[in-house]
Amino acid sequence: MNKYYDLVKAPIITELTNKLIERQNKYTFKVAKTANKVEIKKALESIFQVKVLSVNTRNVLPQFKRKGKFEGYTSGYKKAICKLAPGQKIKILANE
């Protein structure tokens, strides 16, 4: 059970992900780089008690950033877009 909480790190909340939630019932999460689709599906079903139909994953590469004279890279991460069964919801924000 504790392993599942290590796999799913945080939800990704942007305008695009909000549209995905409203229109297609798809939720986006930042997950561990070593996680695979089967592990992500089991973790989400265990943590949120929902039925996950499909999981798509993507590795987000680090991006070069500059702030004045300082340069560096953002950290890369893996994100998972999970489609839930019809009628299922995950309460990510307090006002949902």
Curated annotation (Swiss-Prot):
GO cellular component labels: ribonucleoprotein complex; ribosome
Entry keyword annotation includes Ribosomal protein: yes
Entry-linked Pfam families: Ribosomal_L23
Coiled-coil features, chain-numbered ranges: none
Molecular function terms from GO: rRNA binding; structural constituent of ribosome
Claim: Ribosomal protein is one of the keywords in the record: yes
Record's keyword terms, sorted: Ribonucleoprotein, Ribosomal protein, RNA-binding, rRNA-binding
InterPro entries, per database record: Nucleotide-bd_a/b_plait_sf, Ribosomal_uL23-like, Ribosomal_uL23/eL15/eS24_sf
Protein's GO biological process: translation
Subunit structure: Part of the 50S ribosomal subunit. Contacts protein L29, and trigger factor when it is bound to the ribosome.
Function statement: One of the early assembly proteins it binds 23S rRNA. One of the proteins that surrounds the polypeptide exit tunnel on the outside of the ribosome. Forms the main docking site for trigger factor binding to the ribosome.
Membership in a protein family: Belongs to the universal ribosomal protein uL23 family.
Full protein name: Large ribosomal subunit protein uL23
Native organism: Aster yellows witches'-broom phytoplasma (strain AYWB)
